[in-house]
Amino acid sequence: MAGQKIRIRLKAYDHEAIDASARKIVETVTRTGARVVGPVPLPTEKNVYCVIRSPHKYKDSREHFEMRTHKRLIDILDPTPKTVDALMRIDLPASVDVNIQ
């Protein structure tokens, strides 16, 4: 598979889980002999939700909640069949969304 490239995008709400998953992927790929670029941190997406604290009135009293989505990008250059097999067998937490292109 010379000249090929695999791009892995990771998304998670917890930055520690996404960093541990990225580290595990990089270790697995380097062990199989392919080259790795990354993990590259992409901009964190921040969603803020404003909610009125009281159920009926007092509109001036509000509460803000935020959700941060952390993203990482990993490129695997010149993957071998052994690399692809190792990536399929890797065990990652359920809180990390993995998109492979």
UniProtKB/Swiss-Prot annotation:
Top-rank taxon: Bacteria
Keyword DNA-binding: no
GO biological process: translation
GO cellular component, one term: ribonucleoprotein complex
One matching Pfam family: Ribosomal_S10
MF annotations from Gene Ontology: structural constituent of ribosome; tRNA binding
InterPro entries referenced in this protein's UniProt entry, alphabetically: Ribosomal_uS10 (IPR001848), Ribosomal_uS10_CS (IPR018268), Ribosomal_uS10_dom (IPR027486), Ribosomal_uS10_dom_sf (IPR036838)
Keywords: Ribonucleoprotein, Ribosomal protein
Function: Involved in the binding of tRNA to the ribosomes.
Family assignment from sequence similarity: Belongs to the universal ribosomal protein uS10 family.
Protein name (record): Small ribosomal subunit protein uS10
Organism: Nocardia farcinica (strain IFM 10152)
Highest classification ranks of the organism: Bacteria, Bacillati, Actinomycetota, Actinomycetes, Mycobacteriales
Name of the encoding gene: rpsJ
